[in-house]
Amino acid sequence: MTTQLEQAWELAKQRFAAVGIDVEEALRQLDRLPVSMHCWQGDDVSGFENPEGSLTGGIQATGNYPGKARNASELRADLEQAMRLIPGPKRLNLHAIYLESDTPVSRDQIKPEHFKNWVEWAKANQLGLDFNPSCFSHPLSADGFTLSHADDSIRQFWIDHCKASRRVSAYFGEQLGTPSVMNIWIPDGMKDITVDRLAPRQRLLAALDEVISEKLNPAHHIDAVESKLFGIGAESYTVGSNEFYLGYATSRQTALCLDAGHFHPTEVISDKISAAMLYVPQLLLHVSRPVRWDSDHVVLLDDETQAIASEIVRHDLFDRVHIGLDFFDASINRIAAWVIGTRNMKKALLRALLEPTAELRKLEAAGDYTARLALLEEQKSLPWQAVWEMYCQRHDTPAGSEWLESVRAYEKEILSRRG
């Protein structure tokens, strides 16, 4: 520990103590908040089922930065490199298309054995795993419908895929001792004016009920459902809208997923957390950065990321909110993208933990909105960075931008050889 870091740390403790904040307690609380990193940033959502296939489902990864992972071994190595540069607890979020098999496996036939390497790797790295069925980039999703498909056989294929995915998710939780959150997102929708908006939603409702009909141990598996406003090619109608899934999660008591990019550009999910928590047992967050649409840019330490973190901390939702990331930028170094986005999420959580929330509540309850605003703004200038640097030091990770040197070295030694 450098003398400079020690001095900054001691001064920061004093400054925060003056406003009633115990920084050591804040760091202990930060270690209770794992962030689930998404595997698909590492290979532009290609997966291993058909890596040369097209990405469909109304989503898009733009850019052609060299060095993307081409197989599971490379992806795990890249994840390890990124995780070494991110302090504190982490999880990994997998999609079904990241299975490993020597022979082709139909999506409705995936089994835990196809993910055993991921589980062994997670054990070795002390990680929890989360999961997602992959209802896109497949011949049977090519017409834009999956769980709400009008064709019974196609709809059943996707039902069976989701049911198989739940068993994989439960396997993760059983093996790793921490529940796997399995999120269902489907791209179903229509490009232009839709006459019958009801029937697809009726089919989706029945399909989801069949998907979750098998009772699984909640200590191993948690169901979540995710809405979206629109996607490319589904601009006019999305079957799984916000209202549909809020109603579903409320009535079936599943977790609800709120994705930062899946709403109108003027909406923010930070304002939805406290409302949804009144009706659903748990929330899954997909923290992202939409630029004009669901562009999935790398997460910044911006106002909305901070507001999301503050909602979790202010309302003590540590055990009811699962924090995941969802972005994929192929125009920059993919490992750097993971590091930047995940560190920013953790910085936002730390800043929220360093807020004098009790004092702010008193001011708000007393109607002293002048003092509330003044204190909120003044606390932004408190030396939270010194606390962050100590947190990084204790977790043996770089405190500042020196992490980029490690990424550049890895890029030169490993990524540059991938072609």
Curated annotation (Swiss-Prot):
Classification via InterPro entries: L-rhamnose_isomerase, Rhamnose_isomerase, Xyl_isomerase-like_sf
Positions of Mn(2+) binding: H262, D294, D296
Catalytic activity: L-rhamnopyranose = L-rhamnulose
Disulfide bonds: none
Cofactor: Mn(2+)
The protein's annotated pathway: Carbohydrate degradation; L-rhamnose degradation; glycerone phosphate from L-rhamnose: step 1/3
Source organism, top-level taxon: Bacteria
Primary subcellular site in the record, as a coarse category: cytoplasm
Presence of the UniProt keyword Glycoprotein in the record: no
One MF annotation (Gene Ontology) recorded for this entry: manganese ion binding
SUPFAM superfamilies cross-referenced by the UniProt entry: Xylose isomerase-like
Location(s) in or outside the cell: Cytoplasm
Role, per record: Catalyzes the interconversion of L-rhamnose and L-rhamnulose.
Protein's recorded name: L-rhamnose isomerase
Species name: Escherichia coli O9:H4 (strain HS)
Protein's gene: rhaA
